A protein has these predicted regions:
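Conserved core of the sugar-phosphate nucleotidyltransferase
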Residues: 82, 123-178
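A conserved hydrophobic helix/loop-capping motif in glycosyltransferases and polysaccharide synthases
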Residues: 18-22, 40-41
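Conserved beta-strand segments of alpha/beta enzyme cores
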Residues: 38, 85-87, 170
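Conserved G/P- and acidic residue-centered "switch" motifs that form tight phosphate/ATP-binding loops
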Residues: 23, 37, 119
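Short N-terminal binding/cap micro-motifs at the start of the first secondary-structure element
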Residues: 25-28
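Short catalytic helix/loop segments, enriched in acidic residues and glycine
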Residues: 34-47
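Short Gly/Pro-enriched turn/cap motifs at secondary-structure boundaries
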Residues: 8, 30, 93, 153-154, ...
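Conserved N-terminal catalytic core of the sugar/cofactor nucleotidyltransferase
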Residues: 2-19, 45-117, 121, 128, ...
Length: 178
């Protein structure tokens, strides 16, 4: 991964992040029968470790990871890192995205924060993806900022995606997803 130097002003880059890692990973069965999807290994490194390392690389100082399905696998793995910047938010049952974030709010605080899907894998180009996202943030005009990739640029993906973008850049949720 190509990582550029951090900008001189890190004021706009969130210092806190959450990795959503509580889901069952049903679309990846049978791979996820015994291992949570974020723990799948790609090129010698778990998806979860890739996300953690990417977040720390851009200056994030605290990461909350929600766990539920096969939680002990993630708990043991993260524990082996011996890094007190990582906090686990355990859910008896998966609370879905909104519930998981709400459950972790006491750890997330009131400042902007990143939320990363625990099964997301991306390759940075000339610019670090998270840094690029943070640079687009404008707290005067935004409550949330969503990073999307056009399906035509997604490797090994043959679906329609969750959103439709019109020629003016306006997003709408695909009807079949509602």
């Amino acid at each position: 991964m190509f990582i550029e130097q951090l900008p001189s002003s890190l004021a706009e880059i969130p210092k806190t992040a959450m990795i959503l890692a509580a889901g069952h990973g049903r679309r990846m069965l049978p791979l996820t029968e015994r291992i949570p999807k974020p723990m799948l290994v790609i090129l010698g490194k778990t998806i979860l470790d890739r996300s953690i390392d990417n977040l720390f690389c851009v200056g994030v100082t605290k990461i909350i990871i929600n766990v539920s399905h096969l939680a002990s696998v993630i708990v043991e793995h993260v524990g082996a890192r011996k890094d007190d910047r990582i906090i686990l938010s355990e859910e008896e049952l998966p609370l879905e995205t909104g519930g998981g974030v709400m459950n972790a709010l006491p750890h997330l605080g009131k400042e902007p924060f990143f939320i990363i899907n625990g099964d997301s894998v991306w390759v940075d180009g000339m610019k670090n993806t998270l840094m690029h996202l943070a640079e687009k943030w404008n707290s005067n005009h935004m409550d949330a900022l969503l990073m999307l990739t056009p399906t035509v640029k997604a490797e090994n993906f043959d679906g329609f995606g969750d959103f439709f973008m019109n020629q003016d850049g306006i997003l709408s949720r695909r009807k079949e997803k509602m």
